[in-house]
Curated annotation (Swiss-Prot):
Signal peptide extent: none
Post-translational modification: Phosphorylated by PKA, and by CaMK2 at multiple sites. Dephosphorylated by calcineurin at Ser-555 and Thr-602; abrogating interaction with YWHAB and impairing nuclear import.
Motif Nuclear localization signal positions after renumbering to this chain: 388-396
Region annotation Interaction with FLNC: where it falls in the sequence: 803-1087
Tissue expression: Expressed in skeletal muscle, heart, colon, stomach, uterus and lung. Expression is restricted to muscle cell layers in colon, uterus and stomach.
Biased composition annotated in UniProt, kind: Basic residues: 338-348
Region (Interaction with YWHAB): 551-557, 599-804
Organism placement in taxonomy: Eukaryota, Metazoa, Chordata, Craniata, Vertebrata
Protein name: Synaptopodin-2
Positions bearing Phosphoserine: 300, 319-320, 540-541, 543, 546, 555, 596, 603, 618, 697, 719, 767, 771, 895, 899, 903, 1008, 1050
Positions where Phosphotyrosine occurs in the chain: Y614
Species this chain originates from: Mus musculus
Biased composition (Basic and acidic residues): 101-112, 322-337, 349-359
Length: 1087
């Protein structure tokens, strides 16, 4: 063999090893490494391309063919030890001595003295060129990476290693590098013993040169270690026959003794022995208590074989360059992680993947952090206190919850909690962190029956308790946990008992009984639904609206009474009516609040009769007021719970069924209707308008409900769905309404032509003016006086549009007429008006307008939500404008549109795009008049079509006044309203022609003047101009603005503007709401 370096390379972890071989006996070429894959075990272990493989796991490769080598490699499953020869011309081993010394850590000793003896054995005369290198006895600390346990391994004397081929040319210099390292919690040193012997040492021509090196770069606190000096001792090696016991001892400045002994081996050959005695500092001695004993294996560098020796402490290599180092060996305990003697290199370790390395680093980091938190230098530091506080809070909220979840889940949670809460877990000592490897091993070893002491350093020793293996945890749970476990067990039993019963219930069978079980359950929310889809769809009415107290005996009999088959049938009959998705229909009049039991039902009296009104979209005024109090419910049992009980499913189902259903619901959430969850989900997406809930519902029934009590009655007796709408919100309401049977299907489109009070006037189509104006209080007052007329109330409720409520006689025709006009206006209102004339416009602000009942019933409908809605110009056509909002709009005259539908654009110069055959120049004078009196505005609009062109000069007045002087929203006012406008002689002059013009289109409203007068609400006096004050009255109801304004004032303004007002088209009706916003509405009919 040529000159080269013999290197032992060890890899663990099993195939693939990451290298390819070539050559073999059949090719008459040495077995060499052909290729090495990057980031593989081979590359990490230092194997290089071109290395000649001498032996594999102790099997010489010189006589092996390539297939035999492959077969041999395939048979290796755990660790691979290669003895390779690297040409001396090649570069030195990847690890350079200096870099290793800087990365190794301080040596910790079990005792004050550590003796390491290396034996260099000389071969027989026939193999004079071969040398044997074997450690005779070692007693050094066992160390691995920081994540491994500490310990010492004392190994017996190693058997003689197989011969190692040596070079026959020149001098073969053998270097034995003894590396000793241990982790003592701080950086340490690397001790290198370099023994250089010439090849002719057996001839006594030269002696061994021993170099003992210390790491002067160490940061160890021990000054001796950091101040060590490198010393080289030249020893004259004497053959064994001459001096068998000759020894030379040299001591270094650090107190270490280096002794080279010339001894005799059993075979009689002289064996030079180098003995290094290291003296430990007191500090190191004190740390020996922290070390644990363990055993490991080390591979002989010469052959690659394994023998009992301290792992990763001693590495041997034969190198002519003096730079070769042996490979560390992993401890037998940790077979999964290979370790090189370089402890914490950034490079990949042998047979270690990148992920493993990252995990190891993370663990060490966590360990150091935990140690800092456990034994903090300053326990009062902010970080430590915060850590403790958070852990306490986490512990507080990770306790087992009672009444939810399943037993297995509870067990898991308990285990996690206990594992997470105990920060010190160790078999013998209290370690400072739950992330420690000892803790990890204990927790991961399921079969380990050893007892573990848990120490929570937050709570102190009081919390220490002994746990057996995981299987026994449930039995050992604390009392508090035991209670929850009992509840779960009971529930499970109940589930089993009612499994068959549930099946029957699904088929529609009602099982009676189980009241006692219901009572035992105590406070339970009746969220269970009948197994049938109908029951699921059915209002969770009784059950969900309130917790049912099964305890009350009174409620139980009622339930039993309801359980009757006939009652079941009645309940089923109710189902379609109650189909509307109601979060809590338990009580007829229950408020939207899920748990307000106070207003059980308008009357629990006839349970089944009550549900029909409930189903009706519009509840009676009483029902509507239910939110405020439980009017009829009062007669029911005083406790809210008992009252819902009769209505609760118990009426239709057995208490046992309820219990089972509740358990089932816990286990099978799919059974839930999901209405509440959906509503909640929708609610989270905050609509642009933040009304309470039912602000905007296209359902006509809902509109009627909002308008007034009469409207509600007219719509239907059922208030339940309406209440639900309110509680759930606009979107939920729409959903619920669609599911619920409604007497009149709600128009899908937001802008459908729906009957509205304003529609009462047939002229509406002629001038569809958008008036989102809030009229002065005077109008509200009128509207208040007019409440008797449902249409008026409706007008008020609707956006406070200045639409006059048509007289009761007219409503039907008005509605029809309004249809065309109403379409756009409906957009403004954003509520679909119920075809019923009574309550066409349900608006949040309507309540203040004078529908006192609605306003009280729907307090949430008005207020910031409505204002916000108007400001944001919600595309949904439901919005409310308050007088305050209108006032605010006056400031910014340019954009009154916020309250108007998006389709209409407002221009400061031109009120609205000119309608067909309409000249905006002529109309300007009219808007002023319209602003002053809206009912007259309708008449004026008609007249204005012809006469509005006269007062061109008024255009200027109009431009400035409407916006700056008078804040007004143009509300649609049929031409009829104009007729009533004539206020003063001047007004009358203009109004007369206006009336003439308006009359033809408005003949339908001919009867309205009387009505208008009677109602003083937006009634349209078609023929003669009525007193200004009267006209103002008419306008006021339309505007329905909450702010009262003196009637006389409006007449004056109206009179001033009426002169122009009459001339311009009646298309525009302006309110005196004071809002600058004015919209010109093109009149559908032009003359």
């Amino acid at each position: 063999m040529g000159t080269g370096d013999f290197i032992c390379i060890s890899m663990t972890g099993g195939a693939p090893w990451g290298f390819r071989l070539q050559g073999g006996k059949e090719e008459q070429q040495p077995l060499q490494v052909a290729k090495i894959r990057s980031q593989s075990k081979a590359s990490g272990s230092g194997l290089r391309e071109g290395d000649e493989v001498v032996s594999i796991n102790g099997n010489p490769c010189a006589d092996l063919t390539y297939p035999e080598v492959i077969k041999l490699m395939e048979g290796i499953t755990d660790s691979l030890h290669l003895l390779v020869k690297r040409p001396s011309s090649g570069t030195s081993e990847t690890l350079d001595s200096e870099s290793e010394t800087t990365n190794h850590q301080h040596l910790t000793h079990e005792g004050p003295m550590e003796s390491t003896t290396l034996q260099i054995q000389q071969a027989t005369e026939t193999q004079s060129e071969d040398f044997f290198l074997a450690p005779v006895q070692t007693k050094v600390p066992l160390t691995e990476d920081q994540s491994n346990a500490w310990g010492y391994a004392e190994c017996p004397k190693e058997e003689q290693a197989p011969p190692m081929l040596g070079s026959q040319e020149g001098h073969l210099v053998e270097e034995v590098i003894l590396r000793q390292k241990a982790e003592a919690g701080q950086p340490g040193h690397v001790v290198e013993l370099q023994l250089s012997l010439s090849k002719e040492r057996h001839q006594c021509t030269s002696g061994p040169i021993v170099t003992l090196q210390g790491n002067d770069k160490s940061t160890s606190p021990d000054p001796d270690w950091s101040s060590q000096l490198e010393r080289t001792v030249h020893i004259n090696s004497i053959p064994a026959p001459e001096k068998a016991d000759t020894s030379l001892t040299s001591s270094t400045s650090s107190g270490r003794e280096l002794r080279v002994i010339q001894g005799r081996d059993p075979g009689g050959a002289g064996l030079p022995q180098v003995e290094v005695i290291l003296d430990c500092s007191d500090r190191l001695k004190a740390e020996e208590c922290r070390l644990q004993t363990g055993r490991g294996c080390v591979a002989s560098p010469v052959e690659g074989g394994r023998s009992e020796a301290p792992p990763s402490l001693v590495s041997f290599a034969v190198s002519s360059e003096g730079t070769e180092h042996g490979e560390d060996q992993r401890s037998g305990k940790d077979q999964s992680r290979p370790h090189k003697h370089r402890a914490r290199h950034a490079r990949l370790r042998r047979s270690e993947s990148l992920s493993e390395k990252q995990v190891k680093e993370a663990k060490s980091k966590c360990k150091s952090i935990a140690l800092l938190l456990t034994d903090a230098p300053n326990p009062n530091s902010k970080g430590v206190l915060m850590f403790k506080k958070r852990r306490r809070r986490a512990r507080k909220y990770t306790l087992v919850s009672y009444g939810t979840g399943e037993l297995e889940r509870e067990e898991e949670e308990e285990e996690d909690q206990e594992a997470g809460d105990k920060d010190e877990i160790s078999e013998v000592a209290f370690l400072g962190t739950s992330e420690s490897e000892v803790d990890e091993e204990l927790l991961s070893d399921v079969d380990d029956n050893t007892q573990v002491v848990n120490f929570d350093w937050d709570s102190g020793l009081v919390d220490i308790e002994k746990r057996l293996n995981r299987g026994d945890k449930m039995e050992m749970l604390p009392d508090t946990t035991g209670k929850g476990a009992l509840m779960f067990a009971k529930r499970r039993e109940r589930m089993e008992q009612f499994t068959a019963q549930n099946e029957e219930e699904k088929t529609g069978g009602m099982a009676g009984g189980g009241p006692d079980a219901l009572q035992t359950d105590g406070l339970r929310t009746m969220t269970s639904y009948q197994r049938k889809e109908e029951s699921v769809r059915m209002q969770s009415s009784v059950s969900e609206s309130s917790f049912q107290m099964g305890r009350s005996l009174a409620s139980v009999p009622q339930q039993n009474g309801f359980s009757g088959v006939s009652e079941t049938a009645g309940a089923q009959r109710m189902f379609p009516m109650n189909r509307t998705a109601k979060p809590f229909l338990g009580s007829m009049n229950q408020p939207a609040a899920p748990f307000s039991p106070t207003r059980s039902v308008t009357s629990p009296i006839s349970d089944f009769p009550a549900p029909p009104p409930y189903s009706a979209v519009s509840p009676p005024p009483e029902a509507f007021s239910r939110g405020v109090s439980s009017p009829v419910a009062g007669p029911a049992q005083p406790p809210p719970w008992p009252q819902p009980a009769p209505w609760s499913q118990p009426a239709f189902y057995d208490s046992s069924e309820q219990i089972a259903s509740r358990d089932e619901r816990i286990a099978v959430p799919a059974k839930r209707t999901g209405i509440l969850q959906e509503a909640k989900r929708r609610g989270t997406t905050k609509p642009m308008f933040t009304f309470k809930e039912t602000k905007v519902s296209p359902n006509p029934e809902l509109l009627s409900l909002l308008q007034n009590a009469e409207g509600k009655r007219g719509t239907g007796g059922d208030s339940g769905p309406e209440e639900d709408y309110l509680s759930l919100g606009a979107e939920a309401c729409n959903f619920m309404q669609s599911s619920a049977k409604q007497k009149t299907p709600p128009p899908v489109a937001p802008k459908p032509a729906v009957k509205s009070p304003s529609s009462s006037q047939p002229v509406a189509p002629v001038s569809p003016v958008w008036s989102p104006g809030v009229a002065p209080a005077q109008r509200p007052a009128f509207s208040t006086s007019n409440p008797p007329n449902p249409p008026q109330v409706t007008a008020v409720s609707s956006i406070k549009i200045a639409q006059p409520a048509a007289p009761p006689a007219r409503p039907a025709s008005a509605l029809n007429l309004a249809g065309p006009f109403k379409g756009p206006q409906a957009v403004v209102v954003s509520h679909n008006y119920t075809p019923k004339p009574s309550a066409p416009t349900p608006l949040v602000n309507a309540a203040p307008a004078g529908a006192g009942g609605p306003s009280n019933e729907l307090p949430g409908m008005s207020g910031k939500g409505a204002q916000l809605f108007a400001k944001r110009q919600s595309r949904m056509e439901k919005y409310v404008v308050d007088s305050d909002t209108v006032q605010a709009h006056t400031v910014r005259a340019q954009s009154p549109t916020p309250s108007l539908p998006a389709s209409w654009k407002y221009s400061s110069n031109v009120r609205a795009p000119p309608p067909v055959a309409y000249n905006p120049i002529h109309s300007p004078s009219y808007p002023l008049a319209a602003i002053k009196s809206q009912p007259p505005g309708a008449q004026a609009s008609k007249t204005s079509k012809k006469k509005g062109k006269k007062p061109l000069n008024t255009l200027d007045v109009m431009k400035h006044q409407p916006y700056q002087l008078n804040a007004s929203l143009f509300t649609f006012q049929p031409p009829d309203s104009k007729d009533g406008l004539p206020q003063k002689s001047t007004v009358k002059v203009s109004s007369a022609p206006a009336m003439k013009q308006a009359l033809p289109p408005r003949q339908a409203n001919v009867g309205s003047p009387t009505n208008a007068q009677a109602s003083s609400v937006y009634s349209v006096p078609a023929y003669t101009s009525q007193p200004n004050f009267f006209a103002a009255e008419a306008t006021s109801p339309v505007s329905a603005s909450p702010v009262p304004v003196s009637v006389p004032t409006s007449p004056k303004q109206e009179s001033t503007s009426t002169s122009y007002f009459v001339a311009p088209r009646p298309k525009f009706s302006a309110k005196k709401s004071g809002v600058t916003v004015q919209v010109w509405k093109p009149s559908v009919v032009e003359e």
